[in-house]
Curated annotation (Swiss-Prot):
The gene is pmp19. Residues 1-19 form the signal peptide. This is Probable outer membrane protein pmp19. It comes from Chlamydia pneumoniae. Keywords: Cell outer membrane, Cell wall, Membrane, Secreted, Signal, Transmembrane, Transmembrane beta strand. The keyword Isomerase does not apply.
Amino acid sequence: MKQMRLWGFLFLSSFCQVSYLRANDVLLPLSGIHSGEDLELFTLRSSSPTKTTYSLRKDFIVCDFAGNSIHKPGAAFLNLKGDLFFINSTPLAALTFKNIHLGARGAGLFSESNVTFKGLHSLVLENNESWGGVLTTSGDLSFINNTSVLCQNNISYGPGGALLLQGRKSKALFFRDNRGTILFLKNKAVNQDESHPGYGGAVSSISPGSPITFADNQEILFQENEGELGGAIYNDQGAITFENNFQTTSFFSNKASFGGAVYSRYCNLYSQWGDTLFTKNAAAKVGGAIHADYVHIRDCKGSIVFEENSATAGGAIAVNAVCDINAQGPVRFINNSALGLNGGAIYMQATGSILRLHANQGDIEFCGNKVRSQFHSHINSTSNFTNNAITIQGAPREFSLSANEGHRICFYDPIISATENYNSLYINHQRLLEAGGAVIFSGARLSPEHKKENKNKTSIINQPVRLCSGVLSIEGGAILAVRSFYQEGGLLALGPGSKLTTQGKNSEKDKIVITNLGFNLENLDSSDPAEIRATEKASIEISGVPRVYGHTESFYENHEYASKPYTTSIILSAKKLVTAPSRPEKDIQNLIIAESEYMGYGYQGSWEFSWSPNDTKEKKTIIASWTPTGEFSLDPKRRGSFIPTTLWSTFSGLNIASNIVNNNYLNNSEVIPLQHLCVFGGPVYQIMEQNPKQSSNNLLVQHAGHNVGARIPFSFNTILSAALTQLFSSSSQQNVADKSHAQILIGTVSLNKSWQALSLRSSFSYTEDSQVMKHVFPYKGTSRGSWRNYGWSGSVGMSYAYPKGIRYLKMTPFVDLQYTKLVQNPFVETGYDPRYFSSSEMTNLSLPIGIALEMRFIGSRSSLFLQVSTSYIKDLRRVNPQSSASLVLNHYTWDIQGVPLGKEALNITLNSTIKYKIVTAYMGISSTQREGSNLSANAHAGLSLSF
C-alpha cells in the first residue's frame, strides 16, 4: 500500500517523535500513495527556517488515516517553521487528501507559516474529518495557477469544513489565477462547543482582519455546504472579496443560522466578468445569502442575481452598516423571502446605516420578493405572505436611489423605511452628474389577487423624499407613502390607479412640492385616476407644465385608445390646502394648463390639460385629454422594406448552388474521365454585405449548408449533373430591427457537352425558401411573420480553352446568359400590431463575360487542376423587388421598395481540383464586388467518387 519516494530525504520514526529536516531550502519529491495503516509513520513533518517545497510529478494520494483519537494537529503534513510549497514538476501533478480523520485541526495539513499550492493539475480534499479544517494554517494560504480544486464531503467539528485560517495576526487566504473549476461541495462545519464553533461550512478565517480573496479565476461553485455562521464562507473580522473572476461564481443551496452562503464583516463583489449567482441559500435566522456589516458591489460586468434565498430576516442580504450596490451590469433580486416584515430581499436593522443603490450601466430590479407570516408557510400560499423588497428598521444615516440615463431601479415589490426621521431619501442626487435615469415603484407584476391588497403594493418611507433629476415613476397601481416630498428637478410621473401620499403625524413643515408632473400612460386598460394626497397638516404645492410620460409610442400606436378621444386624470387632495391656480398666470409657482400637439409616429393629435369644474381648495383634479386628428404617421422602423429585400437572399443562395454544379473540370469527361456515375457532396458558405458607410440600410446575408449530387455520362463528351442544396441563412439590415432566418432548398440540373477545347453548358435551378422573422418591440410586444420565397434560374454558356498545343496551361474565355425570377408570397404577421404584406417579384437577366487561367497536371492515377478566373457581370434587365403593406388593425397602407443592388459587378474566382484514382477533392473561393459597395464572398468544398 505504501508507495512513497521520500526515504532518501527524511526518516519517519513515530507519530510523536520524528526526524526533522533542517536546511535553508528543502526540495522533496512526492508521488504514489501514502496511506495511514501505520499511524506513527503517517505524518510528514518539515521545519526548514526558510522554506520547504514538495514537488509533485504525478498523482500523490494521502488517504485512509483513522486518527479520531489523536488530538495533535496535522495528520498528513505538519509544518512547524518556514514557508511550505506544493508545486508541479510535470503538467500531470495532482494532490489528493482522502478519508483522513483527526481529532484536531488540519487533518490534511497544519502549518505555522505560509502555505502555497501552485501549478497543480488537480487538488482534491474529499471525505475528511477534523476539528478545524482539512488544510489549516497560521500563515497565508494560497492557491495559485492550479487547473482544478475540489473540496467535497469534508466535515469539521469546529470552524472551516475544508479550509481554515487561524492565528492572532492578520494573514490572507487567496485563490488567484486558477485555470479550471473551484468546487466546494457538501462540506460541513458542526457547532461543537464554544471553543469549537461551526463557523464556515467550507472556508473559515478566525484570524482577525485576514482577507479571503478569489481573484482572476474561472468558474467557482459553493454548493450544499453547511455551517453555524456562513454556510459556505466565514470571516467575521475581515473581508471576503470576489474580484475579476471570468466565469460564473455560484452559491447554491448553502445553509447556516446566520449568512446562508457568506458571513463576514466585509463582503465585496468587484469587477466580476462572469455572472455571480446566489440561489436557494437559507439562513435559519438572518441573511439568507449574505450576512455582513458592509456589502459593496461595483464594476461587475456580469449579472448579479439573488434568487430564492430565504431567512427569518434579510431573505437575500442582511447588512448592519453599509450596503452599496453600483450596478455596471444587471442586478436582480428575485423570489427571495423572509419572516414578518424583515426584508424579503434586503434587511438593515441598525440605526445609522447606509443604503445606496445606483443603476450605473445596468438595471437593478426587485421582483417576487416576499415576507411570510409564518416561517414554514408555503411560499405559494397567497394568504401567508406579503410582497416586500427592502426593510430598513433603524433610522438610516443615508438612503439614496440613483440611475444613470437609460437605466432603471425597478421596485416591483414595496420597500419600507420603518423609523421616522428627517434624513432625506435622495433620488438621483446632484453629486451624480449622469443620474438622469428612472426609479420605478410598480405593482404591474403582482397577481390579480395580490393587487387587491394595498400592503402588497405600498412602499412606506418615513423620511423626506427629494427628487433631484431623472424620473420617479409610480405605476401599476403602486402606492408610495412618504413623510414629505420635494421635487428639486426631474419628473414625477404617476400611472392610472397609482398614489403618492404623506403618512404619519405630519406638521405644517411637511409638504408635497411638485414642479414637473407627468401622466404615465403605462396602463391604458385602467380608468382609475392617480392620486397625490397630503394627510394631517401637510399641504400640496404644484407648479410647472404637466406632460405625458412613459413609453408613449405604445400609446400613439395603440389602435384602440389613440384613434379616439382618451382621458386620464390625477387627483390632488389635502386636508389642509392644495396650492394650484385655476387659470394661467405669470407667477412661476402657478401651474400652467396648456395644449400640447403631438407630431411623432402613430396617431396624430393633441393633449389638453384642464382642471375639473368641481375643484375645491382641498381637492383639485388635473385632467389630460387626448384628441386625435384622424391622421396616422408610420414609424419608419415598421415600414418593412426588409421583407421584399429577402429575395436577394434567395437570389444569392440560388447563384452559389448553381455555380457549384457547373464545375468546369468535373463536368468535362475529357479532362476527368467519367464512365458510369459520379456522386459528390460537401459544405457551402456565403456572405453578402453592403458597406454600412455608403448605405444607411445595408443588407447582410449569410448562408451555410451543404449539397449532394450525381453526374451521369450520356456519351463520352456529354454529362448530366443533378444536385440538391440545403442552406440555412440569416438576413438583416442596419437600422432595422427585423431579422429573418431561413431554410432554403435548391434543386439544380446541368447539361455539359465538350469537344476538346470548346464546351457548351446549360443549367436550370428551382428553389423553395422558408423565411421566419421575429420583431421584438420594447415595452409593446412581439410580432412574428413567416412566408415563402420561391423561383427559378436558368443559364446557357460556352467556353473555349486554348492554345491546343499546350496541355498544361490554358487560357479559357467564357460567356454566360443567366435569367432569374423569384417571388415572395403574401402573408399576415401574428402578435403585436400585425402587418399584411402583399407579394413581390424580382427578375434579373445578366451577362457574365470573363477569362480563366488554367493549369492542368494530368497523370495516369492522379491529377491536379487549378483555375483562376475573373469576369465582368452586367445585368441587362432588372425588376427590383417591391411590394405594399398595411396595418391590419387600421388598414393604413404604404408602398415598399426593396434594397436595390448595383447592376454591374466584378468577380474573381479560385478553383482547385485534385483527383486520385476514383476520389476527387475540390474547393472553390469566390469574391464579387458589385457597384453600390455590395461585396459578397463564398466558399465551397467537397469530395466526389467516380465509378
